[in-house]
Amino acid sequence: MTANTLTKQIIKFVQLNGGQAERVNNIARKIGNRFVKSNMTKGTADIHCTIKGRSVKIEVKIGRDRQSDAQKLYQQSIESAGGIYYIAKDFDSFYEWYNLNFK
């Protein structure tokens, strides 16, 4: 499974279960012959959600992909502010985590 496919599955699942979810693209854009950095927060999660009134950020990691230092700092800032941060590696483990925390 690709990260793109897993991201779409998670967003659809959250929406079908009454939550709000959106994909956040934090990549540089090509303008003319040069790339311009995004103005998003460095390390932001791939999916931002509100589930049962809670702020949830989900980072999608497939295979050997790991969090960058910026993503680890972002996770710390979300959790210290009372938000929920989850690293999704596959849909089955996400589904289990979701049911443990929101059902």
Regions found by a protein language model. Name each.
Residues 1-103:
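Catalytic phosphate/metal-binding cores of nucleic-acid and nucleotide-processing enzymes, i.e., regions
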